[in-house]
Amino acid sequence: MKNPTLLQYFHWYYPDGGKLWSELAERADGLNDIGINMVWLPPACKGASGGYSVGYDTYDLFDLGEFDQKGTIATKYGDKRQLLTAIDALKKNNIAVLLDVVVNHKMGADEKERIRVQRVNQDDRTQIDDNIIECEGWTRYTFPARAGQYSNFIWDYHCFSGIDHIENPDEDGIFKIVNDYTGDGWNDQVDDEMGNFDYLMGENIDFRNHAVTEEIKYWARWVMEQTHCDGFRLDAVKHIPAWFYKEWIEHVQAVAPKPLFIVAEYWSHEVDKLQTYIDQVDGKTMLFDAPLQMKFHEASRQGAEYDMRHIFTGTLVEADPFHAVTLVANHDTQPLQALEAPVEPWFKPLAYALILLRENGVPSVFYPDLYGASYEDSGENGETCRVDMPVINQLDRLILARQRFAHGIQTLFFDHPNCIAFSRSGTEENPGCVVVLSNGDDGEKTLLLGDNYANKTWRDFLGNRDEYVVTNDQGEATFFCNAGSVSVWVIEDV
């Protein structure tokens, strides 16, 4: 795939009503036209909150909007037929499809069970109370409406290591379930935040139970057969033992008809943790570059005070570009969400230019930046807040520029705290470009591009600058950009 470019086709507040799959099918042609060649779909499985579920409260992995469960047949995004129609439309446009895999936990159990649990210190999960509590917990999943179709696996308390609510006595908190697999506490090879970050929410799936890991492998084979997907986005992997995903990825790659594109969400701003995880899974997955996303957030807030020479310092794309998926925003970092770190709209064209036009990493584009979004939710103070996320002007042009001009050797000119630039040399088949951006005043860079670019006339592909630039006999010229803006200079006749 030439210059892979991923679009996250949803956000946390996408409207209810089952319209997303149909909307995506209608837009598939246009996505191909601007240069999107991979789409990350929201979780397609039935969630505990039914038609209102964003998809991360997984109830039934085998219900893609087919069974009347949790008050609805369709998911928030549509029914199974509409999902498959959307996937077919994408594939007809040579756009690869990534499914979102949410197997850290389950929610919305069908039945209670008598269980035994131990209280856990929420701030240090390694501190587990010796006292064992006899209680009831919602831990049994029978999926009565599906009635064994596709899978007859019944989930019970042996499949889980933790829970956040018990009854008789009624109590909320974090509780370690006592069963045949939890004698040593939580799983290893997880993030060390809170002492051990195995537990996140709901009924925490325990991968030490062999029947559980085999069921999740079976589900992967099933969902690939049902959807013919081209890869996966793996949710919340910092809470899942790395050894499981190493094993799972080996399995799905072995049974898939062609190599799968796999990217995992390990949300940490410590690049060392990301590199450790990549090592633990033998490099079998890419990771989202959370440190870079935070850099963009900080740069957008600080304006001209931010030193752009260091925008990539301490990021995954700098440390390990072959395993980095770069991004400006996602459904967790958007305003009012759990990992809120929004990038101010003025800076987004600069950020997208830095991930779309450089050779390092695979860039991910966020739905609201391409289409806009408006929504309301409660803020930290409990009051309702309205958020308007505008369409980022010229984002479609930047995506198109990636396919047309982001080719050849890359040279960086990160020699000024506010105005930086980079060039792509082009190849025999494809032209290159010069990218100049500034987080301060109007900027300019005098660049020597070499004899191949002697006496060429250049224009700003984005149209932010009206003048033309002409290189001299040595291929040297001064290229410009506006204050707080970016320009992509290309040869006039390409």
From Swiss-Prot:
Active site per the UniProt annotation: D235, E265
Keyword NAD listed: no
Binding site for Ca(2+): N104, D198, H239
UniProt remark on cofactor binding: Binds 1 Ca(2+) ion per subunit.
GO molecular function: alpha-amylase activity; calcium ion binding
Catalytic activity of the protein: Endohydrolysis of (1->4)-alpha-D-glucosidic linkages in polysaccharides containing three or more (1->4)-alpha-linked D-glucose units
Site (described: Transition state stabilizer): D332
EC number: 3.2.1.1
Keywords for the protein's UniProt record, in alphabetical order: Calcium, Carbohydrate metabolism, Cytoplasm, Glycosidase, Hydrolase, Metal-binding, Sodium
Main location: cytoplasm
GO cellular component, one term: cytoplasm
Entry superkingdom: Bacteria
UniProt record, GO biological process: carbohydrate metabolic process
Cofactor: Ca(2+)
Enzyme class: hydrolase
Name of the featured protein: Cytoplasmic alpha-amylase
Species whose genome carries this gene: Salmonella typhimurium (strain LT2 / SGSC1412 / ATCC 700720)
